[in-house]
Curated annotation (Swiss-Prot):
Region (G2): 63-67
Function statement: GTP hydrolase that promotes the GTP-dependent binding of aminoacyl-tRNA to the A-site of ribosomes during protein biosynthesis.
Subcellular location, principal: cytoplasm
UniProt catalytic activity: GTP + H2O = GDP + phosphate + H(+)
Entry EC number(s): 3.6.5.3
Subunit structure: Monomer.
Subcellular locations according to the entry: Cytoplasm
Residues where Mg(2+) binds: 26
UniProt xrefs under InterPro entries: EF-Tu_GTP-bd (IPR041709), EF-Tu_GTPase (IPR050055), EFTu-like_2 (IPR004161), EFTU_2 (IPR033720), G_TR_CS (IPR031157), P-loop_NTPase (IPR027417), Small_GTP-bd (IPR005225), T_Tr_GTP-bd_dom (IPR000795)
Region called G4, residue ranges: 139-142
The gene coding this protein: tuf
Segments forming domain tr-type G: 10-207
Segments of this protein annotated with the region G3: 84-87
UniProt-recorded name of the protein: Elongation factor Tu
Length: 398
Protein backbone atom coordinates (compact mmCIF):
# COMPACT_ATOMS: atom_id res chain seq x y z
CA UNK A 1 0.00 0.00 0.00
CA UNK A 2 1.40 3.42 -0.94
CA UNK A 3 2.24 5.70 1.96
CA UNK A 4 -0.38 8.35 2.40
CA UNK A 5 0.93 11.89 2.07
CA UNK A 6 0.83 14.00 5.24
CA UNK A 7 -2.27 16.13 4.82
CA UNK A 8 -1.48 19.78 5.51
CA UNK A 9 -4.91 21.10 4.67
CA UNK A 10 -6.10 20.86 8.28
CA UNK A 11 -4.69 23.20 10.90
CA UNK A 12 -2.21 21.44 13.20
CA UNK A 13 -2.43 21.89 16.99
CA UNK A 14 -0.25 20.44 19.78
CA UNK A 15 -2.02 19.39 22.96
CA UNK A 16 -1.41 17.14 25.94
CA UNK A 17 -2.97 15.63 29.05
CA UNK A 18 -1.85 16.93 32.45
CA UNK A 19 -2.92 16.19 36.04
CA UNK A 20 -2.26 14.13 39.16
CA UNK A 21 -0.89 10.59 39.01
CA UNK A 22 -3.60 7.91 38.51
CA UNK A 23 -6.33 10.41 37.70
CA UNK A 24 -6.65 8.91 34.22
CA UNK A 25 -4.48 10.94 31.82
CA UNK A 26 -3.24 7.92 29.86
CA UNK A 27 -6.66 6.22 29.90
CA UNK A 28 -8.18 9.41 28.49
CA UNK A 29 -5.49 9.58 25.78
CA UNK A 30 -6.32 5.96 24.84
CA UNK A 31 -10.06 6.76 24.91
CA UNK A 32 -9.67 9.77 22.59
CA UNK A 33 -7.74 7.76 19.97
CA UNK A 34 -10.14 4.80 20.26
CA UNK A 35 -13.39 6.77 20.11
CA UNK A 36 -12.17 8.90 17.19
CA UNK A 37 -11.13 5.72 15.34
CA UNK A 38 -14.68 4.37 15.83
CA UNK A 39 -16.56 7.59 15.06
CA UNK A 40 -14.29 9.24 12.46
CA UNK A 41 -12.31 6.42 10.85
CA UNK A 42 -9.28 7.63 8.82
CA UNK A 43 -5.68 6.63 8.23
CA UNK A 44 -4.68 9.02 11.04
CA UNK A 45 -7.25 7.87 13.58
CA UNK A 46 -5.87 4.58 14.87
CA UNK A 47 -6.85 3.26 18.30
CA UNK A 48 -3.99 3.15 20.81
CA UNK A 49 -4.36 1.05 23.93
CA UNK A 50 -3.28 2.04 27.42
CA UNK A 51 -0.27 -0.29 27.44
CA UNK A 52 1.25 1.10 24.22
CA UNK A 53 0.91 4.70 25.43
CA UNK A 54 2.17 3.83 28.90
CA UNK A 55 5.28 2.12 27.50
CA UNK A 56 6.53 5.44 26.15
CA UNK A 57 10.11 5.26 24.92
CA UNK A 58 12.78 7.28 26.69
CA UNK A 59 13.89 10.37 24.85
CA UNK A 60 16.85 12.58 25.54
CA UNK A 61 16.17 16.28 25.31
CA UNK A 62 19.21 18.47 26.01
CA UNK A 63 20.80 15.73 28.10
CA UNK A 64 17.69 14.99 30.14
CA UNK A 65 15.94 11.63 29.99
CA UNK A 66 12.19 12.02 29.49
CA UNK A 67 9.52 9.40 28.89
CA UNK A 68 6.82 10.77 26.61
CA UNK A 69 4.19 9.16 24.43
CA UNK A 70 3.26 10.99 21.22
CA UNK A 71 -0.02 10.08 19.55
CA UNK A 72 -1.76 11.73 16.64
CA UNK A 73 -5.41 11.94 15.69
CA UNK A 74 -7.77 14.20 13.79
CA UNK A 75 -11.22 15.69 14.19
CA UNK A 76 -13.25 16.97 11.27
CA UNK A 77 -11.61 20.37 11.73
CA UNK A 78 -8.04 19.76 12.87
CA UNK A 79 -5.02 17.49 13.10
CA UNK A 80 -3.65 16.99 16.63
CA UNK A 81 -0.34 15.84 18.08
CA UNK A 82 -1.01 14.77 21.66
CA UNK A 83 1.62 14.15 24.32
CA UNK A 84 1.14 12.09 27.44
CA UNK A 85 3.97 11.59 29.94
CA UNK A 86 3.62 8.70 32.36
CA UNK A 87 5.49 9.94 35.41
CA UNK A 88 5.19 13.21 37.30
CA UNK A 89 8.91 13.94 36.87
CA UNK A 90 8.48 13.43 33.09
CA UNK A 91 5.82 16.15 33.02
CA UNK A 92 7.93 18.61 34.93
CA UNK A 93 10.91 17.99 32.64
CA UNK A 94 8.78 18.08 29.50
CA UNK A 95 7.26 21.41 30.32
CA UNK A 96 10.36 23.16 31.64
CA UNK A 97 12.66 22.05 28.81
CA UNK A 98 10.11 23.08 26.19
CA UNK A 99 10.47 19.56 24.78
CA UNK A 100 6.71 19.38 24.51
CA UNK A 101 5.34 22.65 23.33
CA UNK A 102 1.64 22.57 23.96
CA UNK A 103 -0.82 25.05 22.48
CA UNK A 104 -3.32 23.89 25.07
CA UNK A 105 -3.86 21.04 27.51
CA UNK A 106 -6.58 18.85 28.98
CA UNK A 107 -6.36 18.88 32.78
CA UNK A 108 -7.59 15.50 34.02
CA UNK A 109 -9.01 15.42 37.56
CA UNK A 110 -10.53 12.30 39.13
CA UNK A 111 -13.99 13.19 40.48
CA UNK A 112 -13.38 10.67 43.27
CA UNK A 113 -10.38 12.67 44.58
CA UNK A 114 -10.75 16.24 43.40
CA UNK A 115 -7.63 18.40 42.92
CA UNK A 116 -4.45 16.86 44.38
CA UNK A 117 -0.89 18.24 44.85
CA UNK A 118 0.26 17.45 41.30
CA UNK A 119 -2.95 18.98 39.92
CA UNK A 120 -1.81 22.23 41.48
CA UNK A 121 1.79 21.82 40.32
CA UNK A 122 0.78 21.11 36.72
CA UNK A 123 -1.50 24.16 36.68
CA UNK A 124 1.34 26.32 38.03
CA UNK A 125 3.80 24.90 35.47
CA UNK A 126 1.32 25.53 32.65
CA UNK A 127 1.05 29.13 33.78
CA UNK A 128 4.86 29.49 34.07
CA UNK A 129 5.75 27.99 30.70
CA UNK A 130 3.00 29.70 28.74
CA UNK A 131 0.37 27.00 28.12
CA UNK A 132 -2.47 29.52 27.98
CA UNK A 133 -5.50 27.34 27.35
CA UNK A 134 -6.71 24.58 29.66
CA UNK A 135 -9.83 22.44 29.41
CA UNK A 136 -10.88 20.35 32.41
CA UNK A 137 -11.93 16.71 32.09
CA UNK A 138 -13.49 15.46 35.33
CA UNK A 139 -12.84 11.74 35.06
CA UNK A 140 -14.40 8.72 36.84
CA UNK A 141 -17.82 10.38 37.28
CA UNK A 142 -19.37 6.91 36.99
CA UNK A 143 -17.91 6.17 40.44
CA UNK A 144 -19.63 9.15 42.14
CA UNK A 145 -23.39 8.90 42.74
CA UNK A 146 -23.72 12.23 44.49
CA UNK A 147 -24.46 15.17 42.14
CA UNK A 148 -23.59 17.67 44.88
CA UNK A 149 -20.18 16.11 45.32
CA UNK A 150 -19.48 16.55 41.59
CA UNK A 151 -20.52 20.21 41.85
CA UNK A 152 -18.18 20.71 44.80
CA UNK A 153 -15.25 19.12 42.96
CA UNK A 154 -15.94 21.31 39.92
CA UNK A 155 -16.01 24.45 42.09
CA UNK A 156 -12.77 23.42 43.76
CA UNK A 157 -11.06 22.94 40.37
CA UNK A 158 -12.35 26.28 39.07
CA UNK A 159 -11.12 28.09 42.21
CA UNK A 160 -7.70 26.48 41.89
CA UNK A 161 -7.43 27.56 38.24
CA UNK A 162 -8.44 31.13 39.12
CA UNK A 163 -5.78 31.17 41.83
CA UNK A 164 -3.17 30.71 39.07
CA UNK A 165 -4.67 33.35 36.77
CA UNK A 166 -6.57 31.03 34.46
CA UNK A 167 -10.19 32.02 33.69
CA UNK A 168 -11.52 29.52 36.25
CA UNK A 169 -15.14 30.68 36.01
CA UNK A 170 -15.28 30.52 32.23
CA UNK A 171 -13.14 27.67 31.00
CA UNK A 172 -14.87 24.47 29.87
CA UNK A 173 -15.32 21.57 32.31
CA UNK A 174 -16.44 18.23 30.82
CA UNK A 175 -17.57 15.37 33.08
CA UNK A 176 -17.08 11.81 31.89
CA UNK A 177 -15.39 8.46 32.26
CA UNK A 178 -12.37 7.64 30.11
CA UNK A 179 -12.52 3.95 31.03
CA UNK A 180 -16.23 3.60 30.17
CA UNK A 181 -15.63 5.33 26.82
CA UNK A 182 -12.70 3.01 26.12
CA UNK A 183 -14.94 0.01 26.91
CA UNK A 184 -17.44 1.21 24.30
CA UNK A 185 -20.25 2.66 26.45
CA UNK A 186 -21.93 4.97 23.92
CA UNK A 187 -23.04 7.55 26.51
CA UNK A 188 -19.42 8.06 27.54
CA UNK A 189 -18.17 7.88 23.94
CA UNK A 190 -20.47 10.82 23.19
CA UNK A 191 -18.79 12.73 26.03
CA UNK A 192 -15.33 12.10 24.52
CA UNK A 193 -16.63 13.49 21.21
CA UNK A 194 -18.02 16.49 23.11
CA UNK A 195 -14.58 16.93 24.72
CA UNK A 196 -12.91 16.94 21.28
CA UNK A 197 -15.45 19.46 19.94
CA UNK A 198 -14.60 21.64 22.93
CA UNK A 199 -10.86 21.30 22.22
CA UNK A 200 -11.57 22.27 18.58
CA UNK A 201 -13.49 25.37 19.65
CA UNK A 202 -11.70 26.51 22.79
CA UNK A 203 -8.01 26.08 22.00
CA UNK A 204 -7.14 28.69 19.37
CA UNK A 205 -5.10 27.82 16.32
CA UNK A 206 -1.46 28.65 17.06
CA UNK A 207 0.33 31.34 15.10
CA UNK A 208 2.53 29.63 12.52
CA UNK A 209 6.28 29.95 13.03
CA UNK A 210 6.66 31.71 9.68
CA UNK A 211 4.17 34.43 10.75
CA UNK A 212 6.15 35.35 13.87
CA UNK A 213 8.86 38.06 13.90
CA UNK A 214 12.24 36.94 12.55
CA UNK A 215 14.69 35.32 14.97
CA UNK A 216 17.91 33.81 13.61
CA UNK A 217 20.52 32.69 16.18
CA UNK A 218 23.98 33.36 14.72
CA UNK A 219 26.14 30.22 14.62
CA UNK A 220 28.95 31.30 12.33
CA UNK A 221 30.27 34.50 10.73
CA UNK A 222 32.62 34.99 7.78
CA UNK A 223 33.35 37.68 5.23
CA UNK A 224 33.26 37.44 1.45
CA UNK A 225 35.74 39.81 -0.16
CA UNK A 226 33.96 42.55 -2.05
CA UNK A 227 30.52 41.45 -0.87
CA UNK A 228 30.46 41.86 2.89
CA UNK A 229 29.71 39.91 6.03
CA UNK A 230 27.76 36.64 6.10
CA UNK A 231 26.08 35.29 9.25
CA UNK A 232 24.74 31.76 9.17
CA UNK A 233 22.36 29.74 11.33
CA UNK A 234 18.98 28.06 11.47
CA UNK A 235 16.00 30.40 11.38
CA UNK A 236 14.12 29.88 14.63
CA UNK A 237 10.98 31.73 13.54
CA UNK A 238 9.76 34.21 10.96
CA UNK A 239 11.14 34.87 7.49
CA UNK A 240 14.12 36.81 6.14
CA UNK A 241 14.09 38.49 2.73
CA UNK A 242 16.55 40.44 0.64
CA UNK A 243 16.38 44.20 1.49
CA UNK A 244 14.95 43.55 4.99
CA UNK A 245 16.29 45.81 7.70
CA UNK A 246 17.31 43.70 10.70
CA UNK A 247 18.76 44.16 14.19
CA UNK A 248 21.72 42.32 15.71
CA UNK A 249 20.96 41.67 19.38
CA UNK A 250 22.93 40.31 22.35
CA UNK A 251 26.39 40.35 23.98
CA UNK A 252 26.43 44.18 23.63
CA UNK A 253 24.37 46.75 25.52
CA UNK A 254 23.27 48.35 22.25
CA UNK A 255 21.54 46.74 19.30
CA UNK A 256 23.00 47.39 15.83
CA UNK A 257 21.16 47.60 12.53
CA UNK A 258 22.00 46.16 9.12
CA UNK A 259 20.34 45.43 5.78
CA UNK A 260 20.04 41.97 4.22
CA UNK A 261 21.57 41.97 0.73
CA UNK A 262 21.42 38.23 0.08
CA UNK A 263 20.02 34.97 1.46
CA UNK A 264 21.68 31.65 0.59
CA UNK A 265 20.86 28.06 1.33
CA UNK A 266 23.04 25.16 0.12
CA UNK A 267 25.02 27.71 -1.95
CA UNK A 268 21.90 28.76 -3.85
CA UNK A 269 20.49 32.29 -3.80
CA UNK A 270 17.01 32.54 -2.29
CA UNK A 271 14.42 35.32 -2.26
CA UNK A 272 13.59 34.45 1.32
CA UNK A 273 14.50 32.05 4.12
CA UNK A 274 11.76 30.54 6.30
CA UNK A 275 11.58 29.22 9.87
CA UNK A 276 13.50 25.94 9.97
CA UNK A 277 15.87 26.77 7.09
CA UNK A 278 19.65 26.76 7.57
CA UNK A 279 20.73 29.92 5.79
CA UNK A 280 23.61 32.29 5.25
CA UNK A 281 22.54 35.93 5.35
CA UNK A 282 24.67 38.55 3.62
CA UNK A 283 24.60 41.82 5.57
CA UNK A 284 25.39 45.39 4.53
CA UNK A 285 26.52 47.91 7.11
CA UNK A 286 28.17 45.50 9.50
CA UNK A 287 31.85 44.55 9.81
CA UNK A 288 33.08 41.00 10.32
CA UNK A 289 34.11 41.85 13.90
CA UNK A 290 30.78 43.50 14.78
CA UNK A 291 28.74 40.30 14.81
CA UNK A 292 29.46 37.00 16.56
CA UNK A 293 28.08 33.62 17.52
CA UNK A 294 25.61 33.95 20.40
CA UNK A 295 23.91 37.03 18.99
CA UNK A 296 20.63 36.89 17.10
CA UNK A 297 19.45 38.54 13.91
CA UNK A 298 15.89 39.73 14.47
CA UNK A 299 13.08 41.88 13.21
CA UNK A 300 13.72 45.43 14.53
CA UNK A 301 12.03 46.03 17.88
CA UNK A 302 10.94 42.42 18.38
CA UNK A 303 13.50 41.29 20.98
CA UNK A 304 15.89 43.08 23.33
CA UNK A 305 19.12 42.28 25.18
CA UNK A 306 18.62 41.55 28.89
CA UNK A 307 20.78 40.51 31.85
CA UNK A 308 18.16 39.86 34.55
CA UNK A 309 15.23 37.49 34.43
CA UNK A 310 13.21 34.97 36.41
CA UNK A 311 13.34 31.36 35.24
CA UNK A 312 11.67 28.07 36.05
CA UNK A 313 14.38 25.39 36.08
CA UNK A 314 14.77 21.64 36.48
CA UNK A 315 18.08 20.45 37.97
CA UNK A 316 19.34 17.11 36.63
CA UNK A 317 19.84 14.13 38.91
CA UNK A 318 23.21 12.45 39.33
CA UNK A 319 21.91 9.55 37.15
CA UNK A 320 21.14 12.00 34.35
CA UNK A 321 24.73 13.22 34.44
CA UNK A 322 23.97 16.21 36.64
CA UNK A 323 25.49 17.40 39.89
CA UNK A 324 26.02 15.01 42.79
CA UNK A 325 25.55 17.75 45.38
CA UNK A 326 23.09 20.59 45.97
CA UNK A 327 23.85 24.21 45.06
CA UNK A 328 23.24 27.31 47.15
CA UNK A 329 22.35 30.98 46.73
CA UNK A 330 24.73 32.93 44.44
CA UNK A 331 25.74 29.78 42.52
CA UNK A 332 27.53 30.89 39.30
CA UNK A 333 27.20 28.44 36.42
CA UNK A 334 27.06 29.10 32.67
CA UNK A 335 23.72 29.67 30.97
CA UNK A 336 23.62 28.26 27.45
CA UNK A 337 21.24 30.25 25.21
CA UNK A 338 20.78 28.91 21.65
CA UNK A 339 24.45 28.95 20.55
CA UNK A 340 26.53 30.30 23.42
CA UNK A 341 27.39 30.12 27.12
CA UNK A 342 27.20 33.19 29.38
CA UNK A 343 28.13 33.17 33.06
CA UNK A 344 25.41 34.25 35.47
CA UNK A 345 24.56 34.13 39.15
CA UNK A 346 21.47 32.52 40.68
CA UNK A 347 19.37 33.94 43.53
CA UNK A 348 17.14 31.38 45.21
CA UNK A 349 13.59 32.18 46.36
CA UNK A 350 13.06 33.44 49.92
CA UNK A 351 13.19 30.49 52.30
CA UNK A 352 14.93 28.10 49.88
CA UNK A 353 18.34 27.35 51.32
CA UNK A 354 19.59 24.97 48.63
CA UNK A 355 18.51 23.14 45.48
CA UNK A 356 19.00 19.38 45.23
CA UNK A 357 19.61 17.39 42.02
CA UNK A 358 16.14 16.41 40.70
CA UNK A 359 14.41 19.55 42.05
CA UNK A 360 12.51 22.14 40.08
CA UNK A 361 12.63 25.72 41.34
CA UNK A 362 11.99 29.35 40.35
CA UNK A 363 15.23 31.36 40.27
CA UNK A 364 16.41 34.92 39.62
CA UNK A 365 19.34 35.09 37.21
CA UNK A 366 21.78 37.90 36.51
CA UNK A 367 24.05 37.40 33.47
CA UNK A 368 27.44 39.08 33.02
CA UNK A 369 26.62 39.90 29.35
CA UNK A 370 23.21 40.79 27.89
CA UNK A 371 21.51 38.13 25.76
CA UNK A 372 18.46 38.37 23.47
CA UNK A 373 15.81 36.80 25.68
CA UNK A 374 12.06 37.01 26.14
CA UNK A 375 9.39 35.16 28.05
CA UNK A 376 9.48 31.53 26.87
CA UNK A 377 13.16 31.45 25.82
CA UNK A 378 14.70 28.13 26.90
CA UNK A 379 18.22 27.64 28.22
CA UNK A 380 20.52 25.02 29.72
CA UNK A 381 22.55 25.47 32.88
CA UNK A 382 26.08 24.14 32.41
CA UNK A 383 29.23 23.61 34.42
CA UNK A 384 32.39 23.15 32.41
CA UNK A 385 30.44 22.11 29.31
CA UNK A 386 28.31 19.58 31.19
CA UNK A 387 24.56 20.20 31.41
CA UNK A 388 23.35 20.33 35.01
CA UNK A 389 19.95 21.92 34.49
CA UNK A 390 17.39 23.14 32.02
CA UNK A 391 15.01 26.04 32.19
CA UNK A 392 12.72 28.60 30.65
CA UNK A 393 12.53 32.37 31.08
CA UNK A 394 9.25 33.24 32.80
CA UNK A 395 9.70 36.98 33.38
CA UNK A 396 12.12 39.69 32.23
CA UNK A 397 13.45 41.88 35.05
CA UNK A 398 16.09 44.12 33.43
Amino acid sequence: MAKEKYDRSKPHVNIGTIGHVDHGKTTLTAAITTVLARRLPSSVNQPKDYASIDAAPEERERGITINTAHVEYETEKRHYAHIDAPGHADYVKNMITGAAQMDGAILVVASTDGPMPQTREHILLSRQVGVKHLIVFMNKVDLVDDEELLELVEMEIRDLLSEYDFPGDDLPVIQGSALKALEGDSKYEDIVMELMNTVDEYIPEPERDTDKPLLLPVEDVFSITGRGTVASGRIDRGTVRVNDEIEIVGLQEEKSKAVVTGVEMFRKQLDEGLAGDNVGVLLRGVQRDEIERGQVISKPGSINPHTKFKGEVYILTKEEGGRHTPFFDNYRPQFYFRTTDVTGSIKLPEGTEMVMPGDNVTIDVELIHPIAVEQGTTFSIREGGRTVGSGMVTEIEA
